[in-house]
Amino acid sequence: MIFTLASVPDTMKTLMQAYGAAVVACPTPESRWALMRQGIERLGWYPTGGFVLPPIGSNPYGVDGYKTIAYEVAEDLDWTAPDVLVVPSAYSDGLFGIWRGWTELHALGLVKTLPRMVAAEPFGPLANALERQLDVPERVVSGSSVAFSIASPYGTYQGLTALKDSHGVGVRITDEGIFEAQRALAREEGIFAEPSSIASVTAVMQLSSQRMFDPEQTIVAVITSTGLKDPGASRAWLPPVPSTPDDFDGLLTVLRDRYGLSLD
């Protein structure tokens, strides 16, 4: 059973159903959590996600699964930790789980240092908590965001703990920054990332423009999902595909007017 939101793109709902899930769309996160709680209490369902308000994170076993991202990054970097590791964040399951992975590798002596964790978030509940020196994140003002998977006004204690313990920061990102990062990564690296997952690269670009990194530092941005799950979001920065002209001169005109290509 998967409770999703009615606003989630149809492509994502199709993928969920294709893998065999019973998918139900709810109008709001709160209504989803209420139904989950009833299923847990009345029928003994086993929850893999959170179902309380304010959010406290997901099933601990699921959060621990994110530790393997730290293991993989450490292996790829020849068993050294990056200086900074950036993660798209909402309720911070990934942020906290990855941080736990690094602390365990460090405790075992497999890496000598720990990364500074960065949370990339549309509305900034963790950034707000750090700025105000809060012990627990408070709800912040929210709105719409193309990064809907992480567009939450709530942060969690776990996420704030990961940032505090690693001397990290929260970075507020915008739709404009997301589209810029999505376009750059697709065209320069051949990676088409979903808007929520490209939040990490967006934060890196933002911090880099503010000269927050040393040129010699190793920065890792975790990308969590393919853009093929939400291709409609990219229409905001892509021109409509033109119809095929009847003649070659017409084709040259279309290429010039629509794509800025002068080939004649």
Q: Predicted segment positions?
A:
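Substrate-binding/catalytic subdomain of NAD(P)-dependent oxidoreductase enzymes
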Residues: 85-90, 115, 179-186, 190-209, ...
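Active-site/ligand-binding loops adjacent to catalytic centers
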Residues: 33-54, 62, 104-192, 236-264
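Catalytic phosphate/nucleotide-handling subdomain of diverse soluble enzymes
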Residues: 201-263
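Glycine-rich ThDP/TPP pyrophosphate-binding loop and its adjacent helix/strand module
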Residues: 73-100, 106-107
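Short glycine/serine/threonine-rich phosphate/pyrophosphate-binding segments
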Residues: 1, 9-13, 91-98, 126-129, ...
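A glycine-rich, Thr/Ser-enriched phosphate-binding loop motif common to dinucleotide/cofactor-binding enzymes
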Residues: 56-70, 194-198
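Active-site-proximal loop->helix
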Residues: 1-39, 130-135, 230-236
